[in-house]
Amino acid sequence: MAVKIRLARFGAKKRPFYRIVVADSRAPRDGRFIEKIGQYDPMLPKDNKNRVVVKADRLKHWLSVGAQATERVLWFIKKGIVTLETEPKKTEKKKVENEKAQGQEA
């Protein structure tokens, strides 16, 4: 089962409101999801703190267990709208392995 972190559209016509959800990639866009981890309201001003609200610990958890984020969610992360204190565990393991390999060579 491929799991994605994506936006699910809610709200009314011409008044979009999105939930940031973890869902099976085969599920419909607005259909069943595993967990709601945040929300995005594009109608709010860009400087409003409630425009994008995400549970960062749950986002980190899902990324660490292999969930793939969609382009828009990745954009939120890259722009600093959603902050991740540390990289996912897979990256940390590679760094430790690289440091061990360099230590053995020297």
UniProtKB/Swiss-Prot annotation:
UniProt keyword Chaperone, yes or no: no
A GO term, aspect molecular function: structural constituent of ribosome
Biological processes, Gene Ontology terms: translation
Disulfide bonds: none
One Gene Ontology cellular component: cytoplasm
UniProt entry keywords in alphabetical sequence: Ribonucleoprotein, Ribosomal protein
Listed Pfam families: Ribosomal_S16
Domain of life assignment: Bacteria
Keyword flag Nucleotide-binding: no
Protein family per UniProt: Belongs to the bacterial ribosomal protein bS16 family.
Name of the molecule in the record: Small ribosomal subunit protein bS16
Organism expressing this protein natively: Wolbachia sp. subsp. Drosophila simulans (strain wRi)
Gene designation: rpsP
